[in-house]
A protein has these predicted regions:
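A short beta-loop-beta micro-motif enriched in histidine and acidic residues
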Residues: 37-38, 50-65
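A short, N-terminal "cap"/entry segment at the start of jelly-roll beta-barrel domains
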Residues: 2-44, 88-91, 120-128
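Short acidic-glycine-tyrosine-enriched beta hairpin
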Residues: 47, 77-93
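Ligand-binding loop in jelly-roll beta-barrel domains
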Residues: 94-118
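Extracytoplasmic
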Residues: 37-42, 61, 77, 93, ...
Length: 128
């Protein structure tokens, strides 16, 4: 279950498959990592019922913590809980997202991305 949540969720934050940012995400802080060509981006994402996340990747790692949970619907139509208090990590260049928030609760996440500086935060997954 935790693996499925991690794969499907993280970045609930993308509105379009190749968007560089998301209408769901409010950036709180961005800083360069010392001695690297990477940066850390801390954000809050709020996804309202009916909002969807497209399949996407990040050029680095994304860690998230569910501040306020709800229910999500997977591409196959199955509805699963997305519970408050769960933490997960999406690894570099691993496709995730592709779900819809259902029910009456807005899902709220704290996200921390450690990504390659100068690359888009969100990108389309490569073709299979």
């Amino acid at each position: 279950m935790k693996l499925a949540l991690g794969i499907l969720v993280a970045s609930l934050f993308t509105f379009a498959a190749n968007a560089q940012d998301s209408p769901f995400r409010k950036e709180l802080k961005r800083a360069d990592l010392t001695g690297t060509n990477m940066e850390v981006i801390t954000s809050i994402a709020e996804i309202k019922p009916g909002d969807t996340s497209t399949l996407h990747i990040h050029h680095g790692e994304e860690s998230f913590y569910i501040l306020e949970g709800g229910t999500i619907e997977l591409p196959d139509g199955k509805q699963v809980p997305f519970p408050t208090g769960v933490a997960a990590v999406n690894i570099r260049d691993t496709p995730h997202g592709a779900f819809k928030v259902v029910g009456d609760k807005t899902v709220k996440l704290l996200t921390v991305h450690v990504v390659d500086k100068g690359k888009p935060l969100y990108d389309k997954p490569p073709p299979k």
